[in-house]
A protein has these predicted regions:
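Alpha/beta enzyme core
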Residues: 150-161, 165-175, 186-268
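Active-site beta-loop-alpha junctions enriched in small/polar residues
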Residues: 76-78, 108-110, 138-140, 166-168, ...
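Glycine-rich, positively charged N-terminal anion/phosphate-binding segment
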Residues: 51-61, 76-155
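Alpha/beta catalytic cores of nucleotide-metabolism and tRNA/nucleoside-modifying enzymes
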Residues: 2, 30-35, 42-67, 71, ...
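A structural motif
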Residues: 93, 100, 157-158, 233, ...
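Hydrophobic faces of well-ordered beta-strands that scaffold small-molecule active sites
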Residues: 71-74, 103-105, 133-137, 161, ...
Length: 438
């Protein structure tokens, strides 16, 4: 496997596809390398339809949990609710015969959970057969962290606790939360330690997700990984962008390799996140960085079947066939039914609208259908709109690539004086008084 540093990599390397290629050439059409002026290699995947059968990846162990496929669904506000997670799991089971990955609930605020905010409790809904149940906490305060994690343990609310230190949204960072917080090393360590202490003596692992740093001048991921491991985290996951990048440009996978190398003696897995839009991307990331698993976010928007493809790619099995438009219409209808069961029919249909453009990307459907779906209000109305396409054998054209929000890089909004003292463990004022879900 390649580890990208400031030095050039070796002349050749085995890929997860079993090929050996010189570094100046793409591996099996899946990989290209850019060389920045700074002297840093940035590796990233190219879109490819090639169904490479991978050398099987090792199962991923996160504390007491073992995942046959080292794949995690990233928490996404307003997306990874019980309806979407159920749909992803159904697709994996239907196409691969079992559910092998970890599907994480959308982020909830620790304080809102402890105070039993109605919206927050609704967001923590899990399906009866969902196992393991994974819940992500947003927190900036060790006190609320401990209380929330203890509540999860005492009330059997989840089997896994993840912690969000990766959100780059200005309304979060301006209060010292999300991707701003790991800069405060002592406070960060206190928060992780609080969650681990609350889960002590149980089978509930605590994991931590963070970014490369605030910006290129304030990278925090190496310290964050070391501190998280020292405080008892069972795994860490790195989104290979800074907060300043938000979701723009390309993720710098070489930073995942740096973190993996930095944490080689920690004994805990390092997962990579950023720009996984196809199954081949996951294999490429693991090959290039040596990471132990992948976390997938925007790439699955409108593609809940992606997790079946990822499971196939990373366990050495043939990829399932690409779904036709007819099959996708049935998946859309199922998604709507699940949303209606969770939110009620009217609210559920409104929630579906934002998924429509993602589902239909690359398919030959007219503007009329897209407009009708953007106004859908009942399940019957939805079925009527989809019916003319239910037998369509059409396949999506060029459906891979970036999905969801991308935007532009920008200056990170921080509390006044935030960068003055990284050892300051003062809890930022008012940061935990937020609605769950971002």
């Amino acid at each position: 496997m390649w580890t990208f540093t400031q030095k050039a990599p070796p002349l050749s390397t085995p890929s997860r596809c079993g090929a050996v290629a010189p570094v100046s050439q793409p591996i099996a059409g899946l990989l290209k390398l850019d060389f920045r002026d700074s002297g840093e290699f940035v590796a990233h995947p190219e879109v490819s339809t090639m169904a490479c059968v991978a050398q099987p990846a090792a199962p991923l162990s996160i504390g007491s949990l073992t995942l046959t496929s080292p794949v995690v669904l990233a928490p996404m506000a307003g997306v990874t609710n019980v309806a979407f997670r159920t749909l992803c799991r159904e697709q994996e089971r239907e196409k691969m015969g079992s559910v092998s990955g970890l599907y994480v609930c959308e982020m909830v605020t620790a304080r809102a959970l402890v105070e039993r905010n109605e919206k927050t409790l609704h967001m923590t809904t899990f399906a009866p057969d969902e196992n393991p149940r994974s819940l992500q906490l947003y927190t900036t305060d060790p006190h609320w962290t401990y209380e929330a994690a203890k509540m999860i343990v005492d009330e059997n609310l989840a089997d896994h606790i993840d912690m969000n230190f990766g959100c780059p949204v200005p309304k979060v960072t301006r209060r010292g939360g999300g991707s701003a917080l790991p800069y405060k090393r002592k406070l960060f360590g206190n928060i992780v330690a609080a969650a681990v202490r609350a889960a002590e003596g149980t089978d509930i692992p605590v994991t931590v997700k963070f970014r490369v740093g605030i910006d290129d001048a304030h990278k925090t991921h190496l310290d964050a990984g070391r501190i998280a491991a020292a405080e008892g985290a069972a795994a860490v996951a790195l989104h290979a962008r800074t907060a300043a990048q938000r979701y723009s440009g390309k993720a710098n996978w070489s930073e995942i390799a740096r973190l993996k190398e930095h944490m080689a003696d920690s004994g805990i897995p390092v997962l990579g996140n950023g720009d996984i839009f196809a199954a081949s991307d996951a294999a490429a990331m693991m090959d290039q960085t040596g990471c132990d698993g992948v976390v997938v976010g925007r790439g699955c928007l409108g593609r809940p079947w992606l997790f079946a493809e990822l499971a196939a790619q990373l366990t050495g099995r043939p990829l399932p066939p690409q779904p036709t438009l007819g099959e996708v219409t049935r998946i859309i209808q199922r998604h709507a039914e699940l949303l209606a069961a969770h939110h009620g029919e009217e609210h559920g249909c409104r929630e579906l609208r934002k998924h429509v453009s993602w589902y239909l990307r690359g398919f030959p459907v007219g503007g009329d259908m897209r407009r009708d779906l953007a106004r859908v209000s009942t399940l019957t109305h939805l079925a009527d709109i989809l019916a003319p396409f239910s037998d369509s054998p059409a396949l999506a054209d060029d459906a891979d690539g970036a999905r969801g929000r991308q935007g532009s890089p920008g200056k990170v909004v921080l509390p006044e004086g935030w960068l003055d003292d990284p050892e300051d463990d003062t809890v930022p004022e008012g940061a935990d008084i937020m609605h769950s879900g971002g």
